[in-house]
Design a protein with these regions (language model features):
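Residue-level signature for tetratricopeptide repeat
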Residues: 28, 44, 81, 133, ...
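Helix-turn-helix DNA-binding segment
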Residues: 437, 441, 451-454, 488-535, ...
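Structural detector for internal amphipathic alpha-helices that build alpha-solenoid repeat scaffolds
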Residues: 40-48, 334-342, 367-374, 423-430, ...
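Alpha-solenoid helical repeat architecture
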Residues: 33-37, 70-73, 100-111, 119-132, ...
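Alpha-helical repeat scaffolds
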Residues: 56-63, 88-99, 116-123, 143-154, ...
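Inter-helical turn/loop elements of alpha-helical hairpins
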Residues: 3-7, 11-121, 133-145, 189-200, ...
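Amphipathic alpha-helical scaffolding segments comprising HEAT/armadillo-like alpha-solenoid repeats
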Residues: 36-39, 348, 382, 432-444, ...
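Extended repeat-based scaffolds of very large eukaryotic assembly and lipid-transport proteins
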Residues: 416-455, 459
Length: 558
């Protein structure tokens, strides 16, 4: 793992921020009380429909603080900012002025404050209101399947009403819409669809919109983590959480929305990002007074603590499950999955998988099915897991230890299932003997797809053991395409063929943070033997120390 960027300290998103990053023309005009100039500047950068922009909380607090003469545009700005901060009393005051239309703001307010069992957004006769309400309701109800359908429809929607609104700078809004459409579609695909599509859309989003738009940070981090979910290395500098904590970060509501959109993927990180984001979300939800936002955040705090070794009682899982019984389908998925992760009971995973399927939450479905195949392979799970892996691109299911992924791959191969996804799932499992077994079942099966057999040969080349290299030499004598692929790998003359099985096993455990004593106990060997294996591995890899050897080993695995 080479992801860089330390977590920021806890942040109060309601605390005052300086105005250092605002345009000089805006702050200078305010300093000399030139209110027409201030209004003119604001109309180019302040959008009451999408309040979170390049200047973040600095601009929002400036608009609330500056003593501008009141008019309908300023009231609309401030009413939207009140929604962003959960200032429901302030919102009531702005609505009472009769200077602005209430339906949009009231609809969003009611969605935020809706109970756990809410399953549909407020009704409206206007199409642009229905579309806006559905987005918020999908987010607060975690209705992944419905959200994915919404995200696919959204690019075709063109709101004529924008041209008649003075509180929306149309140029910036149109550029932002292209960015938002790509990011939301990427998020929807990452949670409930195709990871290759999600990665491509996230990459495209990085080129859209204006510079410093926070949605670009979402796209950047999502692209990195989706690539890892597809089997790639986890590398790059993640910046979303630091952006949220900065003065130009998003409003409280916007921060909850964007952090929730990538929350499951924070579980890949071992730096506390998941709990940091979940606790921030809980603080926001409490200040907003949102039952559904608070329930989601509490659930993710429990997930982070369970991943850290805490028991179900310590994280209050029983209370979450009790609340989940009456909740909308999307809100039930993670609590049910957590119950299964704690109990390891196949029946609990089956219930979690059913809930995930109902909500359209593909990531949770893949997780539950992977555990089921590893624990208790049955015909239905053996049929559906490889189909989902192939169609969605998942290779590192969330909340699935590498050893469980390896067991699932072996179970699929032993049951006669063949596919590139199965070979790659075995590879990320990190157990050389399992990868060899799965690869050989594909290579020896003449009925296996050509792409899967080629992937199996490639997997043998990546394992990095003497045994795997011997197998490749044997395969290279074949006269078919498999033999040609083996000869090409052998011709590369890479280092990774020099490690023994035991050296590989010891180095793999060392890179996961185990001490020599821990490894010795795990493998029933002496600490002296472990030290010798590590020394041999370092020498063969040309590594100066244990950490460098672990890093080179990880490169070999990828």
């Amino acid at each position: 793992m080479t992801v860089s960027g330390a977590l920021p300290p806890p942040v109060d998103l309601w605390a005052p921020v300086p105005f250092d990053d605002l345009p000089a023309g805006l702050t200078d005009a305010a300093a000399r009380s030139d209110w027409p100039a201030v209004k003119a500047q604001l109309r180019t950068i302040m959008d009451s429909n999408t309040t979170d922009g390049a200047y973040g909380r600095e601009l929002l607090q400036f608009v609330m603080k500056v003593p501008l003469p009141s008019d309908s545009v300023l009231v609309r700005y401030r009413a939207s900012i009140s929604v962003d901060h959960g200032d429901w009393d302030g919102l009531q005051g702005y609505l009472a002025s009769d200077l602005i239309e209430a339906i949009e703001l009231v609809g969003i307010r009611d969605i935020i404050l809706a109970p756990l069992d809410r399953r549909a957004p407020p009704s409206s006769s206007a199409e642009h209101h229905r579309i806006l309400f559905e987005l918020y309701d999908c987010q607060f109800g975690r209705a992944v399947g419905r959200f994915r359908r919404w995200a696919r429809r959204m690019p075709a929607f063109y709101p004529e009403v924008l041209w008649g609104r003075d509180d929306i700078p149309v140029g910036r809004h149109m550029r932002y819409r292209r960015l938002q459409d790509a990011v939301l579609r990427a998020v929807a695909e990452a949670h409930g669809g195709s990871l290759p599509v999600a990665e491509a859309l996230a990459a495209e989003a990085g080129t859209l919109g204006d510079e410093r738009e926070p949605q670009r940070d979402v796209a950047h981090d999502l692209e990195i983590m989706v690539r890892h979910a597809r089997g790639g290395r986890l590398e790059g500098e993640l910046g979303l959480l630091r952006r949220i904590a900065s003065p130009t970060g998003l409003s409280p509501l916007g921060s909850w929305e964007v952090s929730s959109s990538v929350m499951p993927f924070f579980s890949y990180l071992d730096d506390g990002s998941l709990e940091w984001a979940a606790r921030l979300g809980q603080n926001i939800a409490m200040r907003l007074g949102s039952p559904r936002a608070q329930f989601q955040s509490r659930t993710w705090i429990a997930a982070a603590r369970i991943a850290d070794g805490k028991s179900a009682d310590e994280v209050g899982l029983a209370g979450l499950l009790a609340q989940a019984r009456g909740a909308a389908p999307g809100l039930r998925v993670v609590p049910l999955l957590l119950r299964a992760l704690v109990s390891h009971r196949p029946e609990d995973f089956r219930i979690a998988e059913s809930a995930a399927r109902q909500a359209g939450s593909v990531w949770a479905q893949v997780t539950a099915l992977t555990w089921l195949v590893a624990l208790n392979p049955q015909p239905v799970t053996l049929r559906w897991l490889p189909r989902l892996l192939e169609s969605t691109g998942w290779r590192r299911p969330l909340f699935v230890p590498a050893s469980v992924a390896a067991d699932a791959a072996l179970g699929l191969a032993a049951a006669g299932k063949r596919g590139v996804s199965i070979v790659e799932l075995a590879g990320v499992g990190g157990r050389a003997n399992v990868t060899v077994e799965v690869a050989m079942r594909h290579i020896d099966d003449a009925e296996a797809p050509d792409a899967a057999r080629a992937a199996a040969v490639d997997a043998l080349g990546k394992i990095g053991t003497t045994h795997s290299r011997e197998i490749l030499h044997r395969i290279s004598r074949r006269t078919d395409g498999i033999g040609l692929a083996a000869r090409r790998i052998l011709a590369k003359g890479t280092l990774n063929g020099t490690l023994s099985e035991r050296e590989l096993e010891v180095l793999d455990l060392a890179r996961h943070g185990l001490t020599n004593k821990d490894i010795a106990e795990r493998l029933s060997l002496s600490r002296h033997t472990i030290a010798r294996h590590l020394a041999n591995a370092r020498a063969k890899l040309g590594a100066a120390n244990r950490a460098e050897a672990a890093a080179k080993f990880e490169e070999m695995q990828v």
